[in-house]
């Protein structure tokens, strides 16, 4: 049988869960096999992320992606014609070299990533393998999931500055068992919010976005919902939050303007400790300090990283060079991984390997502007990333990721599927 090569690469402009344009890419092999991928987009974006190419101008508020689509249909299509789809690293390197910039500003990370993901899908389809199996082989595990059930910050129009309040299933006999506990808690939380006199409208990621007084009130509602759903906080369901502190970091004063008050970095750290004391079921904090405030980020890790998961997102942006620097500085103990922050499957794999090699955990992540594409679910299982955050158990673009994990568990066999837990499980000893 003749070996398949890439015949055609093409793209189109579609729309994401926020109604914004994004790129959908097709990779078609010489035997007609199709791989298709849809590219997500973030609202809370780190300054060091690869460039998402937008059209500018009046059309669609300047957010069109026809330039990126054209780059796929012309330059990338020409360069990849006849290439080997089973050599992912080579495909990605061709596009990186073709772009020629350090942040993919010429062709657009949204163009390059769409093709990178679609290539992996085409190769898996050609071999008649599930994507997670093609990318990961046989040593696979289902992730610990983190669900953003109260939205604040850039993800909601309310007065809360912390961006994501998450719940995660601790005790679970299967992925389905853990997810059902999350669903029960989510529906209970809706009633807790409404009983307190707030509306229960949804934010970008499917979590509720009530106009609460402050972040402590949000945590209290999570605590109450866990108990009312019939679970023990910290034992069966734990809490995590993403401060996304870059968005309330004052670059002039180097302080933090948070929910009507100004905090020095030390005072902000004390505030987090007060929350931990009141809600000991908090097990993970993401971006407690701004992406430029590496010293305080590292100091907080040194002081509390042995008892708390501390996740770095905006300071490192899935970039292996930045991850290496963060490791050298002792910043965080978990690296958030987002495919579109770096822009290719191969570079994302390199970021995960680098973190793991240095004893860091990893958490895969969706973006606030999502599509129905489930690539991130397969990728999480394939890489044994151990943790995944993909939003609340609501809104189809979020739930579809979890539904895909349910399918994967079924395919692996519920009894034999390995479940990931926190590395060095210090939080639950």
Curated annotation (Swiss-Prot):
This is Enolase 2. Keywords: Cytoplasm, Glycolysis, Lyase, Magnesium, Metal-binding, Secreted. One of its GO terms (molecular function) is fibronectin binding. The keyword Cell wall biogenesis/degradation does not apply. PANTHER family: ENOLASE. The keyword Signal does not apply. Its cofactor is Mg(2+). Binds a second Mg(2+) ion via substrate during catalysis. Catalyzes the reversible conversion of 2-phosphoglycerate (2-PG) into phosphoenolpyruvate (PEP). It is essential for the degradation of carbohydrates via glycolysis.
């Amino acid at each position: 049988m003749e070996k398949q090569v890439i015949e055609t690469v093409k793209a189109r402009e579609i729309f994401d869960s926020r109604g914004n344009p994004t790129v959908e890419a097709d990779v078609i092999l010489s035997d007609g096999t199709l791989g298709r991928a849809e590219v997500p987009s973030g609202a809370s974006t780190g300054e060091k992320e690869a460039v998402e190419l937008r059209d500018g101008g009046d059309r669609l508020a300047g957010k069109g992606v026809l330039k990126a689509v054209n780059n796929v249909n012309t330059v990338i299509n020409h360069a990849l014609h006849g290439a080997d789809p089973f050599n992912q690293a080579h495909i990605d390197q061709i596009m990186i070299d073709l772009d020629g910039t350090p942040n993919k500003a010429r062709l657009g990370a949204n163009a390059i990533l769409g093709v990178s993901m679609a290539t992996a899908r085409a190769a898996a389809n050609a071999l008649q393998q599930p994507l997670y199996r093609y990318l990961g082989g046989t040593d696979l595990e289902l992730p610990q999931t983190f669900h953003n059930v109260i939205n604040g910050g850039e993800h909601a129009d309310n007065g809360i500055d912390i961006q994501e309040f998450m719940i995660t299933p601790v005790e679970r006999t299967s992925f389905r068992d853990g997810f059902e506990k999350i669903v029960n808690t989510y529906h209970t939380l809706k009633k807790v919010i409404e009983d307190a006199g707030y509306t229960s409208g949804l934010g970008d990621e499917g979590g509720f976005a009530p106009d609460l007084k402050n972040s402590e009130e949000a945590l209290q509602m999570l605590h109450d919902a866990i108990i009312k759903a019939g679970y023990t906080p910290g034992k069966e369901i734990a809490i995590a939050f993403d401060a996304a502190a870059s968005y309330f970091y004052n670059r002039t004063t180097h302080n933090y303007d948070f929910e009507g008050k100004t905090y020095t970095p030390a005072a902000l750290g004390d505030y987090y400790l007060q929350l931990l004391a009141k809600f000991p079921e908090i097990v993970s904090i993401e971006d407690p300090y701004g992406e430029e405030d590496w010293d305080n980020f590292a100091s907080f890790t040194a002081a509390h990283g042995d008892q708390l998961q501390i996740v770095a997102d905006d300071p490192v942006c899935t970039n292996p060079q930045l991850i290496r620097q963060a490791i050298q500085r002792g910043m965080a103990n978990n690296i958030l991984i987002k495919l579109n922050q770096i822009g290719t499957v191969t570079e994302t794999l390199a970021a995960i390997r680098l973190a793991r090699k240095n004893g860091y955990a990893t958490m895969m992540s969706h973006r606030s502007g999502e599509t129905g594409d489930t690539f991130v679910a397969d990728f999480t299982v394939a890489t044994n990333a151990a943790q995944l955050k993909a939003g609340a158990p609501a809104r189809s673009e979020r739930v579809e990721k979890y539904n895909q994990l349910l399918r994967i568990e079924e395919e692996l066999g519920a009894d034999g599927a390995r479940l990931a837990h926190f590395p060095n499980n210090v939080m639950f000893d």
